[in-house]
Amino acid sequence: MSSPAPKSPELSDKSKKYDRQIRLWGEHGQTLLEAATVCLVNVTAVGCETAKGLVLPGIGGFTVADGSTVKEEDLGNNFFLDSSYLGKSKALACMQLLQELNPDVNGDYVDESADFLLANRPNFFDSFDLVIASNLNEQTLLLLAERLWELNVPLIYCRSLGMLGTIRLQIREHCIVEAHPDNRQFDLRLEHPFDALREHLDGTEVTSKVPWLLVLHKYLNVWQKQQADGTQTPRNYKEKNQLKETIREEMKADEENYEEAIKAVNTAFGAGQVPKSLKAIFEDDACEQLNKKSNVFWIMAKALKHFVIHENEGHLPLPGVLPDMTANTDSYIALQHIYRQQALQDADQVYHKCQEYLKQLALPADSIDERSVRLICKEAAGLAVIRGTRIAEEYEKSSRLLPLVEDNELQGNLTAYNFALRAYERFLSECGNIPGECIVEQDIGRLKSIAAKMLSDLGMHATISDDVLHEICRYGGAELHAVSAFIGGCAAQEVIKIITKQYKPIDNTFIYNAITTESVTLKL
């Protein structure tokens, strides 16, 4: 009687609950998410949808700040509110309804407006990892953005008006360790094998049962001897075809590992070099000049640079990851073990250099752990740093804005709508009411004047077309929940990228037109 198959380890309740998202950003990403707290400024449909996209995956906590009460018009704009909350605190209603989605998340609320908090409780925003805001007038937006820039707290500002929506990310510096590139190349180090790999490759007989890596190594050696100029790896289409033919000539029928080796010729070489993006990080002043306030990312980056230049002949640490290969289990596991051991050895050298730097800076040794170093070594080729701009810079003269103007008129393109929404916010500040809420024709004229002055102040010799401004007034400040749901979902995704330090966030503005289903990302 055969023995029963071993059981898979039991998943915890949390792992079962968040299984799909953990597949995207891992247990370590989930841990960062559950440790984060965010603030939602203003209860709007787009704000609630953004918060929903964070509460469902298990954000650590959220606080809602809004000084208004629920009115009849809110019920039509925001599906999160119902008639039972009429006349009650909008912040409380939002907090309670969001918490129902995930009782594991801590919720809080403050019955105060952003203006009041900035004027009377300026330290209110200090403790948050990120702030999400919507439906602010220009003056309040700029005050909030400047305060958060000083605190180095990221801000996601969302707009949803009629069929239009935008997201603006303000972040001082964002260091990305796990960028999750679409086309990741496996670093196999065939052209520069380390000692343990060379011994294994040279000492193993090539049969139909071994991984294709051994097949490719064997016939790469044959091909190298045929090169009069001493070329070590195929550099172009012709040379790659020569190597493929060398393998094909020795292949017997139905040898899958030989077929895989032939296919791998195109992608098996060239990894392990320092890409331009990483060179820029190595040459950055933040990497060159460490101090006690340096982000641990920069300390690890400098240790990584030292390893590459002084200890690894210009090559990156080995990630230690192999692609799937047709082979018997023992031979594949043996090869996998060699790569993993070398990856651990490389990471250990980088870790010890990190500890040296921490000691020099008089920082605690536990500021950087081995797991973090192993991760940055594994992902070294994809490291990225984004340095954002202040929202206030958009309201100052900037050459960055000039290329957005075509033929001296901002027509019905997405850039025009972005400027029109900014004119809408200035209208709120100067006039104290929503354009189009009461006397539409009168408000259109005022909005035109505000838009013209705004563009003139920016040094832009352009106008926003009447059709665009008419459309803004026609919306009368109304949110369409379907548009808000889309913008909120996108914004929540950006928040998660920032908190988990995975995937590249927008840099820095996303604009969406639901009428034409067009979208664009701009750096403003």
Curated annotation (Swiss-Prot):
<comment type="subunit">
    <text>Heterodimer of Uba3 and APP-BP1. The complex binds Nedd8 and UbcE2M. Interacts with Appl (via the intracellular domain, ICD).</text>
</comment>
<keyword id="KW-0833">Ubl conjugation pathway</keyword>
<dbReference type="GO" id="GO:0120500">
    <property type="term" value="C:NAE1-UBA3 complex"/>
</dbReference>
<dbReference type="GO" id="GO:0046982">
    <property type="term" value="F:protein heterodimerization activity"/>
</dbReference>
<dbReference type="InterPro" id="IPR030667">
    <property type="entry name" value="APP-BP1"/>
</dbReference>
<comment type="similarity">
    <text>Belongs to the ubiquitin-activating E1 family. ULA1 subfamily.</text>
</comment>
<comment type="function">
    <text>Regulatory subunit of the dimeric Uba3-APP-BP1 E1 enzyme. E1 activates Nedd8 by first adenylating its C-terminal glycine residue with ATP, thereafter linking this residue to the side chain of the catalytic cysteine, yielding a Nedd8-Uba3 thioester and free AMP. E1 finally transfers Nedd8 to the catalytic cysteine of UbcE2M. Required for Cul1 and Cul3 neddylation. Appl and APP-BP1 interact antagonistically during development.</text>
</comment>
<dbReference type="GO" id="GO:0045116">
    <property type="term" value="P:protein neddylation"/>
</dbReference>
<dbReference type="Pfam" id="PF00899">
    <property type="entry name" value="ThiF"/>
</dbReference>
<dbReference type="GO" id="GO:0019781">
    <property type="term" value="F:NEDD8 activating enzyme activity"/>
</dbReference>
<dbReference type="GO" id="GO:0001540">
    <property type="term" value="F:amyloid-beta binding"/>
</dbReference>
<dbReference type="InterPro" id="IPR035985">
    <property type="entry name" value="Ubiquitin-activating_enz"/>
</dbReference>
<protein>
    <recommendedName>
        <fullName>Nedd8-activating enzyme E1 regulatory subunit</fullName>
    </recommendedName>
</protein>
<comment type="pathway">
    <text>Protein modification; protein neddylation.</text>
</comment>
<dbReference type="InterPro" id="IPR045886">
    <property type="entry name" value="ThiF/MoeB/HesA"/>
</dbReference>
<dbReference type="InterPro" id="IPR000594">
    <property type="entry name" value="ThiF_NAD_FAD-bd"/>
</dbReference>
